[in-house]
């Protein structure tokens, strides 16, 4: 049994997929398997993988036949096939930096069930020195509360014990919102290394925003689930620090409910947010709830642009 399973979910990216796999093969950490989970690609993905398999029997190819097509179902397919004690995911359009896996696994061997680091952003072919993960500035242990309070955000790269997930999987009804599964990674000791381990490629800066808008109801479901997780934590721990974040998640659920034109869910989540903690964003959204969606999206883009400047 390999120590580490590297899962590479893929769909119609045969050229970039080969680069991703080779970046794994070039790692100095060798006790691993490479699980390629193909979401029924229509290009030559399978042939690319088969050619690489000729010289490396650690590479395994699995067609996603048991889950719905889509990022979450494809990742679940990969998880089902992983046999390593530890697991990590590498997107098919990303690459690992030299020494990434050995550094993370060395820290894991010190008794950490979850170790993660940062990524370098590559925008439209230009590699920058900018980290994709925000909020963490030094090597440190990370608690479940840090995660739930959203003290850090963005793209990171991690290795974790597969046992932390037990039999839990990504919810196929959600669009994104992986945090509903990642919360399980903080059951045991977690450690963050303030260093880049992966190249995170962004081809269109607005692609995530556009995707979220087109799948607004599924994004709403994810935020609603996150809010419920926070509310349960608040109820169990009596820690008032959770109130602000919990209210914020209900507000985000309300925002996407509006984009999905589900007004019953919109007002239910807004009033839930305000009942937990009176907050300006929820009040503003309540006022804006009568404004058409296309205007809300334009105002949101203006706000993001102003925050960057």
UniProtKB/Swiss-Prot annotation:
A Pfam family matched in the record: Glycos_transf_2
Enzyme kind, highest EC tier: transferase
Phenotype on disruption: Loss of the glucose branch in N-glycans. N-glycans however contain the entire 6-mer, demonstrating that Glc plays no role in determining the length of the GalNAc backbone. Cells show levels of colonization of chick cells similar to those of the wild type.
Swiss-Prot/TrEMBL keywords: Glycosyltransferase, Membrane, Transferase, Transmembrane, Transmembrane helix
Localisation per UniProt entry: Membrane
Topology within the bilayer: Single-pass membrane protein
GO MF term set: glucosyltransferase activity
EC number: 2.4.1.293
Domain of life: Bacteria
Predominant place of localization: membrane
Transmembrane segments: 273-291
GO CC terms in record: membrane
Reaction(s) the record says it catalyses: [alpha-D-GalNAc-(1->4)]4-alpha-D-GalNAc-(1->3)-alpha-D-diNAcBac-tri-trans,hepta-cis-undecaprenyl diphosphate + UDP-alpha-D-glucose = [alpha-D-GalNAc-(1->4)]2-[beta-D-Glc-(1->3)]-[alpha-D-GalNAc-(1->4)]2-alpha-D-GalNAc-(1->3)-alpha-D-diNAcBac-tri-trans,hepta-cis-undecaprenyl diphosphate + UDP + H(+)
GO BP terms in the entry: protein N-linked glycosylation via asparagine
Pathway info: Protein modification; protein glycosylation
Similarity annotation: Belongs to the glycosyltransferase 2 family.
Extra information: N-linked protein glycosylation in C.jejuni consists in the transfer of a heptasaccharide (GalNAc-alpha1,4-GalNAc-alpha1,4-(Glcbeta1,3)-GalNAc-alpha1,4-GalNAc-alpha1,4-GalNAc-alpha1,3-bacillosamine) from a membrane-anchored undecaprenylpyrophosphate (Und-PP)-linked donor to the Asn side chain of proteins at the Asn-X-Ser/Thr motif.
Function: Glucosyltransferase that adds he final branching glucose to complete the final heptasaccharide structure in the N-linked protein glycosylation pathway.
Protein name in the entry: GalNAc(5)-diNAcBac-PP-undecaprenol beta-1,3-glucosyltransferase
Native source organism of the sequence: Campylobacter jejuni subsp. jejuni serotype O:2 (strain ATCC 700819 / NCTC 11168)
């Amino acid at each position: 049994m390999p120590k580490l399973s590297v899962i590479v979910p893929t769909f119609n990216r045969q050229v970039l997929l080969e680069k991703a796999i080779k970046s794994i093969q070039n790692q100095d950490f060798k006790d691993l398997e490479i699980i390629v989970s193909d979401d029924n690609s229509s290009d030559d993905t399978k042939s690319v993988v088969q050619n690489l398999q000729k010289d490396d029997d650690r590479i395994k190819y699995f067609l996603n036949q048991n889950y719905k097509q889509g990022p979450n179902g494809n990742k679940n397919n990969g998880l089902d096939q992983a046999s390593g004690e530890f697991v990590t995911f590498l997107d098919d359009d990303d690459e690992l930096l030299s020494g990434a896996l050995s550094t993370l696994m060395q820290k894991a061997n010190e008794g950490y069930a979850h170790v993660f680091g940062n990524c370098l952003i590559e925008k439209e072919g230009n590699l920058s020195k900018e980290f994709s993960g925000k909020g963490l500035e030094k090597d440190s242990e990370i608690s479940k509360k840090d995660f739930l309070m959203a003290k850090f955000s963005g793209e990171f790269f991690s290795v974790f014990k597969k046992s932390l997930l037990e039999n839990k999987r990504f919810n196929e009804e959600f669009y994104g919102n992986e945090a509903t599964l990642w919360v399980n990674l903080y059951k045991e000791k977690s450690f963050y290394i303030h260093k880049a381990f992966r190249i995170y490629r962004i081809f269109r800066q607005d692609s995530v925003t556009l995707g979220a808008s087109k799948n607004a109801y599924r994004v709403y479901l994810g935020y609603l689930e996150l809010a419920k997780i926070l509310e349960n934590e608040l109820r169990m721990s009596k820690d008032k620090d959770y109130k602000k974040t919990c209210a914020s998640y209900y507000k985000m659920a309300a925002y996407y409910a509006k984009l999905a034109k589900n007004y019953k869910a919109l007002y239910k989540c807004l009033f839930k947010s305000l009942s937990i903690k009176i907050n300006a964003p929820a009040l503003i959204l309540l006022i804006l709830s009568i404004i058409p969606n296309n205007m809300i999206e334009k105002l949101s883009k203006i706000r993001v642009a102003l925050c960057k400047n």
